[in-house]
Design a protein with these regions (language model features):
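Nucleotide/phosphate-binding catalytic cleft detector across ATP-hydrolyzing
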Residues: 1-14, 20-76, 80-207, 235, ...
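Residue-level signature of catalytic and energy-coupling elements of molecular machines
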Residues: 10, 19, 78, 174, ...
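A short acidic Gly-Thr/Ser loop motif
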Residues: 10-16, 80-81, 207-214, 220-223, ...
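Short, solvent-exposed amphipathic alpha-helical segments in soluble enzyme
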Residues: 25, 200, 342-348
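Phosphate/pyrophosphate-binding loops at sites that engage ATP/ADP/AMP, CoA/4′-phosphopantetheine
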Residues: 62-74, 304-325
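Glycine-rich phosphate-binding loops at beta-strand->alpha-helix junctions
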Residues: 81, 162, 262-264, 320-346
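Short beta-alpha connecting loops at secondary-structure transitions
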Residues: 226-227, 240, 288-293, 325, ...
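Glycine-rich phosphate-binding/hydrolytic loop that grips phosphoryl groups
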Residues: 355-400
């Protein structure tokens, strides 16, 4: 019987933890084999603040995904997010010993390793070194220098930095939940892979991923990551505003936001009222949808304006840096009614909602194609793309060993030849090694 491979993406968010099991089908699409969800109780604004609760939530999501798929989860691809993440631009160069030899992968590795040695602020660690453009002997705008001749190799890098303690806590939760660490990605980059097309990345696009605890931004131009940022506000702060503004409990505030919430107050009439049941026999509380929308609008405007400042800081106003493809909204917060129209009004940029369905097989559940699961699908795609992280299919639950003797007599299949690692695989391994040793 032909061995089947599958991979797992684990999205550790502020409001939910999602485990998605999938594999690549013969058409290059992702086939979803199982999904598990759990309420996230130990994460605040993308950062673990309760180890025990986070471990329990991870185990619950993993167990549910195993039951749903009938498969055993061993290794997971995870994301890094949170307000501790920051990014910077850096240029560096190396002088090659022999300019008569063509530039090889080792030369690019040496240049990247040099960037990893940069001294950061106390308690910070470089977690991503992403090349943007290379120069060879002064010749600029080179995307791939390998195979060229030259003595001086330069590059511009987008460097992502994280807080060591925050990263260690995620690693500890993964390992304490009985899992191995596979692919590691900055979450907005994972979401971008799931919802953006290559054409959008080439034309210039800003991905805004509105999660429960944070709003993440990733800007692409000419197919290259140009800017990343984390805004420390997400859907949860909107819920908190509704809770305080309407004097109701958090659960009621969240339901109000989902069912009746709108980012555009003008859409609601003054006489539209919703009644909220009172607590322990108290009288019901009446709330006008107009007032509800005003509360939501005020916070959403604040978030969008902060994101727009980041977009302008990148240089969107410059003709050369213009984001022709506009803005793509994703994440659970992107489902807020009239948010798209408000973003277009504030920024003046074309905006669409990003769904991770383009890369999914046609028979995938409709639920998984929601913007809510963009990061999880992106993390799964990263795991699937790395052959080294594939795991053989095996039952999740205990089974009888009747086939044990029979299987011993079957002819061993030859192990497939490992593909040659490119520089991106090596950078991922470097980050993985750092996280594995972070305890």
């Amino acid at each position: 019987m032909k061995e089947t491979h599958y991979s797992v993406g684990l999205d550790i968010g502020t409001t939910k933890i999602v485990a998605i099991i999938g594999k690549e089908n013969e058409y290059g699409k992702i086939e979803i084999l199982g999904i598990g969800k759990a309420k996230s109780l130990g994460v605040h604004r993308g950062v673990v603040n309760n180890i025990t609760q986070t471990i329990e939530s991870i185990q619950q999501a993993i167990s549910q995904a195993e039951t749903d798929s009938g498969l055993k989860i061993d290794t997971v691809s995870v994301g890094i997010a949170g307000q501790h993440i920051r990014s910077l631009q850096h240029s560096d160069y190396i002088t090659r010993a022999n300019a008569e030899e063509v530039i090889g992968p080792d030369d690019v590795d040496n240049l990247c390793n040099q960037v990893y040695k940069l001294v950061m602020l106390p308690g910070e660690e470089i977690i991503h070194v992403l090349p943007q453009e290379f120069k060879v002997d002064g010749q600029a705008e080179i995307k791939e220098p390998i195979g060229m001749y030259g003595g001086r190799l330069e590059a511009n890098f987008h460097v992502v930095v994280g807080q060591v303690s925050s990263i260690k806590n995620i690693v500890r939760c993964i390992k304490s939940a009985g899992l191995k660490l596979g692919e590691i990605s900055l979450e907005p980059l994972a979401s971008a892979n799931a919802v953006l097309s290559q054409e959008e990345k080439e034309a210039g696009v800003a991905l805004i991923d509105i999660g429960g605890g944070t709003t993440d931004l990733a800007i692409f131009k000419d197919g290259i990551i140009r800017h990343t940022a984390v805004i420390p506000f997400g859907g949860n702060v909107i819920t908190e505003d509704i809770k305080e503004g309407c004097s109701i409990i958090e659960k009621q505030a969240e339901l109000l936001k989902i069912k009746f919430g709108s980012a555009w107050p003008g859409e609601n009439k003054e006489n539209e009222i919703v009644s909220i049941p009172g607590l322990r026999g108290r009288d019901p509380k009446e709330i006008t949808l107009k007032n509800l929308s005003k509360i939501i609008h005020a916070r959403v405007v604040e978030i969008v304006e902060q994101v727009y400042v980041e977009i302008k800081n990148y240089g969107h106003d410059e003709q050369k840096k213009k984001l022709i493809a506009g803005i793509v909204l994703t994440g659970g917060g992107s489902q807020l009614k009239h948010l798209k129209q408000l973003v277009e009004y504030i920024t003046g940029m074309d905006t669409r909602i990003g769904y991770p369905n383009e890369h999914l097989a046609g028979d995938s559940e409709e639920e998984i194609a929601s913007p809510l699961y963009a990061t999880g699908v992106g993390l799964l795609m990263n795991a699937v793309a790395s052959d080294a992280k594939y795991a053989p299919e095996q039952p999740a639950l205990e089974e009888t060993e009747e086939k044990g003797t029979e299987e011993q007599n079957t002819e061993e299949t030859k192990a497939p030849k490992a593909p040659r690692k490119n520089i991106f695989d090596k950078w991922s391994e470097k980050l993985k090694d750092f996280l594995d040793n972070a305890e």
